[in-house]
Amino acid sequence: VEVATVKNCGKKLLATPR
């Protein structure tokens, strides 16, 4: 469960334009 959360956060950060 924790791993999935981390992956989701990373994907959101990558998808979000800086």
From Swiss-Prot:
Its main location: secreted. Expressed by the venom gland. It comes from the Eukaryota. One of its GO terms (cellular component) is extracellular region. The keyword Methyltransferase does not apply. Keywords: Disulfide bond, Isomerase, Secreted. It is found in: Secreted. One of its GO terms (molecular function) is isomerase activity. Acts cofactor-independently. Heterodimer with venom peptide isomerase heavy chain; disulfide-linked. This is Venom peptide isomerase light chain.
